[in-house]
Amino acid sequence: MTRSPRSTAWLRVVSLSLAAFIFNTAEFAPVALLSDIAASFSMSAAQVGLIITIYAWVVGLMSLPCMLLSSDMERRSLLIKIFILFAISNVLSGLAWNYWVLIMARIGVALSHAVFWSITASLVVRLAPADKKAQALSLLATGTALALVLGLPLGRVVGQYLGWRVTFVLIGLIAAVIMVGLMKLLPVLPSSNSGSLKSLPLLLKRPALLCVYGLTVMIVTAHFTAYSYIEPFILKVALLSENFTTILLLIFGGAGIIGSMLFSRYSSKYPAGFLIVSFAFLAVCLLLLLPLSFSGWSLSTLCIVWGIAIMALSLGMQVKVLTLASDATDVAMALYSGIYNIGIGGGALLGNQVITHLGLPDIGYMGAAMAILATVCCIFTFVRYSHVLKTSLTN
């Protein structure tokens, strides 16, 4: 049966959303399996949590160099090469016989991640129907949210009953299946508007874009100061069961899907207010993490709001980058991906230090302090650069 060009375009967007799903499942799998990995290597959760920092900082440091090295490559073949490295590295993660082998395997996953996220958002915009670009980005974000709502809880269930190693091997096998789908669905995609090293000085002369990058690293650091250690927090501070921990991760991810839907509906109407409110709600959630940990119901409610906020603001910042750098999208998104992951790594490291010197219960307060500062800076940025930031991605 012959498909219409519009349905074909949506199938391609869906295929990239599935790719986003498996990449984000792999990135955040250690969050759901932290205690099990720590027990396997006779280490503490805080020590093992550093693999999140290492992974994120490899992505942060390598996103732009990897993108520039591949800037002239045809995108379909580049995606296939990325998936081959990704699948092999995940299988090796599952087979890791010591902590250092696990780190090396995770670095392989991180390198594939660095290239994937530097090109994928712009590819989705390019492949989407002409009048549905913001919705296509929202669908890509849904792939990310599904990694939280399905990938992390299912990965945790598999790890709980079959061992954490099986989780990583399964991720590698699923990635291979998605790769075959991409090979069949995607057309030849010559590099377009990728930019080059010459684009970098031009981007760095755009103060509004630099502010968006700065806000990104601040709010992501705040989020991951607490979220990197949410599993041991639920188990050891909230004193909830392992099964309820899985349910909370499911709730958090489901809230991310709601955040994606809210973004699709309201971000164009309220480009400034939508982001500022998202920042503020994230700050409130982190501030209330410990006070509301007294019961499963209160913590579940908090996770719903938290999940909505982080997804909404992540999407909002991504659209601002694409809008402010439409002439060099791949370079701009490589920088965004790198900066986002520097925030992830910084948050995981800051959380590690909070646990070491203050205690696990205080991770929310430290994250909240960062988030409040980020919210104030967000308001200032939108006031200062309102003429360029109060725009949306419409074409």
Curated annotation (Swiss-Prot):
Keywords: Cell inner membrane, Cell membrane, Membrane, Sugar transport, Transmembrane, Transmembrane helix, Transport. Gene3D superfamilies: MFS general substrate transporter like domains (1.20.1250.20). It is found in: Cell inner membrane. It is a multi-pass membrane protein. The chain crosses the membrane at residues 13-33, 48-68, 82-102, 107-127, 134-154, 168-188, 207-227, 244-264, 272-292, 297-317, 331-351, 363-383. InterPro entries: MFS, MFS_dom, MFS_Efflux_Transporters, MFS_trans_sf, Sugar_effux_transptr_put. GO terms for cellular component: plasma membrane. Its main location: membrane. Pfam families: MFS_1 (PF07690). Belongs to the major facilitator superfamily. SotB (TC 2.A.1.2) family. NCBIfam families: PRK03545.1. This is Probable sugar efflux transporter. It comes from Pectobacterium atrosepticum (strain SCRI 1043 / ATCC BAA-672) (Erwinia carotovora subsp. atroseptica). The gene is sotB.
